Structure formats: structure tokens, C-alpha cells
Amino acid sequence: MGTFLLLMAEASAVGGELAEGGAEGGFGLNTNILDTNLINLAIIITVLFVFGRKVLGNTLKTRRENIETAIKNAEQRAADAAKQLKEAQQKLEQAQAEAERIKKSAQDNAQTAGQAIIAQAAVDIERLQEAGAADLNAELDRAIAQLRQRVVALALQKVESELQGGISEDAQKTLIDRSIAQLGGGV
């Protein structure tokens, strides 16, 4: 601080000498830096203080409001994002539960359908076995009937051949006696 005052004093002395020389000639240059600078600084500081305070205050106020608004917007967006995330997680959980339910239902349906198919196959096999047995019995009955017809036909054929060959006398006599006995007469 002492150095500053010393410089001011020397500048004043030099400036005073120059000013005196300028006053003699009519026009002079005030080289007293401290005098001129102090006045200029006082004017600038006053202007800055009076007008700059308002401008700077308004600028800072606007800047603060912008920052506060940006912070509020960011907080609101963060809250909205958190809410949307929570909703999305709930929807995901619901979708996973629904998928699990559908999967279990499909497995149950597949198992039920498989059991139904197996049961139907067993019924079909039983029906086919019964139909096969019925067909076999029908074929057996038809074969037996054909054999009977064949036996009867062969017996008739034999009888006819014997009848055409004639009956022996003893057989004719026995036949006649039997017929008379049946009619009620006796021989």
C-alpha cells in the first residue's frame, strides 16, 4: 500500500509540471495519470454500479430462473421416467404371469388331449376286436352252414343214388312191415 501511495505522489508531481507547461501554451495535456484515472475510474465505477447492478442482477436472476426451471424439468422428467419404469415393470410381471398361465393351460390341455386320444384309441381297438370277433363268428357260422348244406346235399345224393339203384327185397319188406305197423295193422 505504501508503494502505491508513493507512485501516486510522484505521478502527481510529474503531471503538475506538465500541466503548468501546457497552461502556458494554452493547450496542454494532463499527464497526471492518477488524477485522470481516478476521475475516470470513479465515473466508470459509478456507472457500472448504477446501471451494471440492474443489468447484472437481471442477468443473474434470469440465469437463476433458467437453472431452476431446468432443474425442475429434469426432476419432473426423472419422476415421470421412474413412474413409467414402475408401470412397465408391473406390465412385464403381469405379462410373465399371463405367459406362465397360458403355458400351464397349454400343458394341461395337451395332457388332457393326449389322454383323450389314448382312451379313444383303446375304445377303437376294442371295437375293432369286437368287430373282428363278430366277423370271425359270422364266417364260422357261414362255414358251418355251408358244411351242413354240403353234408345234406351229399346225403341226399347218396339216398337218390341208392333209390335209383333199387332197394333190396329184405329192405323193401322191412319198410312195408314198418309202415303197416305204424298204420295200426299187424301182420
UniProtKB/Swiss-Prot annotation:
The keyword Transport applies. It is a single-pass membrane protein. GO terms for cellular component: plasma membrane-derived thylakoid membrane; proton-transporting ATP synthase complex. It comes from the Bacteria. The chain crosses the membrane at residues 32-52. F(1)F(0) ATP synthase produces ATP from ADP in the presence of a proton or sodium gradient. F-type ATPases consist of two structural domains, F(1) containing the extramembraneous catalytic core and F(0) containing the membrane proton channel, linked together by a central stalk and a peripheral stalk. During catalysis, ATP synthesis in the catalytic domain of F(1) is coupled via a rotary mechanism of the central stalk subunits to proton translocation. Component of the F(0) channel, it forms part of the peripheral stalk, linking F(1) to F(0). PANTHER family: ATP SYNTHASE SUBUNIT B, CHLOROPLASTIC. This is ATP synthase subunit b. It comes from Nostoc sp. (strain PCC 7120 / SAG 25.82 / UTEX 2576). The lineage of its organism: Bacteria, Bacillati, Cyanobacteriota, Cyanophyceae, Nostocales.
